């Protein structure tokens, strides 16, 4: 069984999905599963994902019956994930090749969430401010975040314990179609 499930919601991202998948399959830590969630786009994203799935059996593709939008697409991926830890990757992003390995190095049985830094890519790698420079308990983490200026809360850039994430999803009313932005902050 994989230790980390990488959830890749997919909706009209044919321009980016190959790079995202390459960054997953080439992780230095190999004990992963990659779940591509087809959210009913109308481009070639899923055809591209299927080509990768033929070559790598760690890739699973699930198909939503209708466009569920990002939050619910992520939830569908989490529900089928086999690993105890979940990492969300937006299809237009990619992981450094040692991202999972670095997370695993600091995992222990009490780890509920690991946050890591990101880069904005223009013509050069321009790092976003280092938000996470220490280890925090949940009780100390949220007060720390509240004090940060300009903190962008995203589901990506974090490794979540699956059971805690499922609990958070169950607290939400995912049938509320009015959730169309900032859904990352709800998790």
Q: What is the meaning of each model-derived region?
A:
Residues 12-26:
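Short, well-formed alpha-helical segments that are part of the catalytic scaffolds
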Residues 23, 38-47, 66:
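A conserved acidic beta->alpha catalytic loop
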Residues 64-81:
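Glycine-rich, basic loop-to-helix element that forms the pyrophosphate-binding segment
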Residues 86:
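Short aromatic/hydrophobic "clamp" motif used to bind/position activated sugar donors
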């Amino acid at each position: 069984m994989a230790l980390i499930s990488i959830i890749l919601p997919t909706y009209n991202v044919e321009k980016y999905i190959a790079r995202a998948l390459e960054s997953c399959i080439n992780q230095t830590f190999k004990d992963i599963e990659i779940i591509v969630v087809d959210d009913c786009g109308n481009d070639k994203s899923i055809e591209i994902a299927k080509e990768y799935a033929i070559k790598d059996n760690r890739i699973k593709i699930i198909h939503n019956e209708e466009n569920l939008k990002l939050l619910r697409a992520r939830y569908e991926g989490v529900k089928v994930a086999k690993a105890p830890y979940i990492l969300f990757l937006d299809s237009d992003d990619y992981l450094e090749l040692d991202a999972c390995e670095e997370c695993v190095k600091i995992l222990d049985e009490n780890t509920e969430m690991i946050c890591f830094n990101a880069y904005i890519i223009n013509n050069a790698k321009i790092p976003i401010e280092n938000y996470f420079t220490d280890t925090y308990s949940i009780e100390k983490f949220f007060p720390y975040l509240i004090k940060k200026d300009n903190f962008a809360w995203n589901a990506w850039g974090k490794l979540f314990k699956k059971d805690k994430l499922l609990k958070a999803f169950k607290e939400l009313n995912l049938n509320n179609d009015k959730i169309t932005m900032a859904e990352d902050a709800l998790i």
